[in-house]
């Protein structure tokens, strides 16, 4: 896979709580230089990134209900709509993991569906299921709920929990949602080999803060 092809599959990510404006500017400049699919940033920087990337092919991606997923549906939906209004074209939302593990599947599905419907096609919705907190059965259920709710992607991890993406989880998720939804692998992907492993397992998108190292095969 050549550099350009791989770059188009990467969300160049900076979600650290201490991320400052200068770092966001640098992230956007790097995304333009390398041709990454998007920058994935915290909501407060969405409009700044939109202004920096306007007119390019690089999308603005942000996170909702992040990183716990425990906010109410109303709060998540408000966050998402506000982000889209400020220039985001991709939303990575976290499911309510506790409700999923409690067996409250209807709530989890409705949580996603409400957000998808409110956005009304103005942005891609990627649903973070936080694989490290789920058993395989729960992972499959979460993926199928995301599919029923009208999401566009399922995503492995926030990168803020015990562990991130594994190729086994990516393959499991791909089998659960393909061909309707795509899979984003995120969390702990730091090398070219890591990225290719995830892509070979079924990932169409990679979330990484080590994007440039990955592209340069460092």
Swiss-Prot record:
The active site is at residues 92, 155, 184. Catalyzes a reversible aldol reaction between acetaldehyde and D-glyceraldehyde 3-phosphate to generate 2-deoxy-D-ribose 5-phosphate. It comes from Clostridium kluyveri (strain ATCC 8527 / DSM 555 / NBRC 12016 / NCIMB 10680 / K1). This is Deoxyribose-phosphate aldolase. SMART domains: DeoC. Its EC number is 4.1.2.4. It is found in: Cytoplasm. Its main location: cytoplasm. NCBIfam families: deoC. Gene3D superfamilies: Aldolase class I. Keywords: Cytoplasm, Lyase, Schiff base. It catalyses: 2-deoxy-D-ribose 5-phosphate = D-glyceraldehyde 3-phosphate + acetaldehyde. One of its GO terms (biological process) is 2-deoxyribose 1-phosphate catabolic process. One of its GO terms (molecular function) is deoxyribose-phosphate aldolase activity. The lineage of its organism: Bacteria, Bacillati, Bacillota, Clostridia, Eubacteriales. The keyword Nucleotide-binding does not apply. SUPFAM superfamilies: Aldolase. One of its GO terms (cellular component) is cytoplasm. Pathway: Carbohydrate degradation; 2-deoxy-D-ribose 1-phosphate degradation; D-glyceraldehyde 3-phosphate and acetaldehyde from 2-deoxy-alpha-D-ribose 1-phosphate: step 2/2. Belongs to the DeoC/FbaB aldolase family. DeoC type 1 subfamily.
């Amino acid at each position: 896979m050549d550099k350009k092809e791989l770059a188009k599959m990467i969300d160049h990510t900076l979600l650290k709580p201490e991320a400052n404006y200068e770092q966001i500017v640098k992230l956007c400049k790097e995304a333009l230089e390398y041709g990454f699919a998007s920058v994935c940033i915290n909501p407060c920087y969405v409009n700044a990134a939109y202004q920096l990337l306007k007119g390019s092919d690089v999308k603005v991606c942000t996170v909702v209900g992040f990183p716990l997923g425990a906010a109410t549906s109303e709060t998540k939906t408000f966050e998402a709509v506000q982000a889209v209004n400020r220039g985001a074209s991709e939303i990575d939302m976290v499911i309510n993991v506790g409700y999923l593990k409690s067996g409250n599947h209807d709530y989890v599905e409705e949580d996603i569906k409400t957000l998808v419907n409110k956005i009304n096609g103005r942005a891609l919705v990627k649903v973070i299921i936080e694989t490290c907190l789920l058993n395989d059965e729960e992972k499959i259920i979460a993926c199928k709920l995301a599919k029923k709710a009208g999401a566009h992607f399922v995503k492995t991890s926030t990168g803020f929990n015990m562990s991130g993406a594994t190729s086994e989880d990516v393959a499991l998720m791909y089998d659960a949602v393909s061909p309707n939804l795509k899979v984003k692998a995120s969390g702990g992907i730091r090398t070219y080999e890591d990225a290719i492993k995830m892509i070979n397992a079924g990932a169409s998108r990679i979330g990484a803060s080590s994007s440039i190292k990955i592209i340069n095969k460092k």
